[in-house]
Amino acid sequence: MKIKHILLGALMTVIAAPAIAQVEKDEVKEQVIAILKSGAEDKHKQVSSLAKEFKKDAAKLASVGKAYLAEKDYENAKKYAAMAVKANSKSAEGFILAGNIAVALDDAGDAATQFQQAMYADPKNPNGYRRYAQMMSKASPQDAVNALEALRQQRPDYPVDLIAAEIYSDAGKMDLAIQYYDKVSINDMKDYQISDYATNLFLSQNFDKSLSIATQGHSKFPRNASFNRLMMFNNTEKKDFAAAIAAGERLFTASDSAKISSFDYGYYGRALEGADKYQEAIGIYEQMLQADNVKADEKLEVNKKISDCYKKVSNYAKAEEYLNKYIQGHPQSSFSLEESVAELYADQLSDDKTPAAQKQASYEKADALYAALGQKYPDNAAYVANKRAQMPFSLAIDQKAQLKLAGPHYIEFANIMAAKSNRSAGETKMLINAYNAATAYYVHVADDMEKAKEVATKVIEIDPENENAKAILSLK
């Protein structure tokens, strides 16, 4: 299956769990926030007194500024950022705080400068590199990763590859994200990173490897919805429907905090259909119709899926019911939409479960519908004539009776195709077959040998060695 580009963002949102950063406890920041929220008239004075206790500690001064930033008091946040830089110009903390303030004020240029200053001030501190990379990840993923590669030179122990993978993934550069994820052991990844890795592989249509990564993730986090989802998706694409169904059951019934999406319903339904479990598939599609988070246009398509499933189990009444819902949901009609009803009746002719008497009624209905389609859509007249010619041969009647019903439509098809100046080789072959059927009709039904030979002559003009035409022309 080729996944359309416009679906990538939606699929990524559905599959991958959000990254949750681990935040270290900052006691100074928490203490200052408590003071600021107290409503005391002298709250700023209290903070100032506290800050004097560590006036030469850049990290703690920056923590005071972080508290002001959290309260959106940008002027005081800037004040403590400057104090942190003054206390120790070789510490990255004051510059990082200044960069974060600039980000909050939508000043990307100043933010970039401050984070770069942090890198220069303390090359071993990863936070300046990381904040710069995060800020640049959308505008210039390559610059972001270049900063991380510079960090690698300073801190070989730091998980640069994982961060780079996440940056490229967020930027939609799946191949580069995969390259960086490939460098990291699964054991060194958190659950959301394993999920993101497998998701990028899935969206790149590397279903085997995506399944392998998702399976490893599932073994570590068996109730993680993302891994059950990815196992269902990948196994469905690989047509291992039994495994896909098992994963689908876990996703729907044995996953923590699973938010079921339209993609989940769709893939689970596909897997059930692939395993010929049409009634179960109908049940899933019915759930999809009731789901609040499924869009109206998606629900419209589900009606067609349900109709197809009912057709597979020979429940044509239900198939027509849902097919009509599907058709009625389209504001404009079309040949293909209207033909789908005729096709539904035509399909009953080749279904062994359809009683002979019902086949006759279905044939008459299908033939009438195709006749109306031919009148309404003259550009499709040849197609319609050919369909009407083929249907009688599925009826439980003798060959002459079949030919009596089919013959006029073969003649109509042949007349249309013969007048076509730019026939393809395939169409010419269809024309010859129609002519041969017409000769049989004239010989065995109409008892008109002259007409049969006239048609046979036309065949010889196209195909001089045609044995059927030669045989007709040799008759006395």
Predicted regions and their residues:
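Alpha-solenoid helical repeat scaffolds
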Residues: L7, L11-M12, A16-A446, A471-K476
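Low-complexity, intrinsically disordered Gly/Pro/Thr-rich segments
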Residues: A452-K458
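Bacterial N-terminal signal peptides that target proteins for export
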Residues: M1-L7
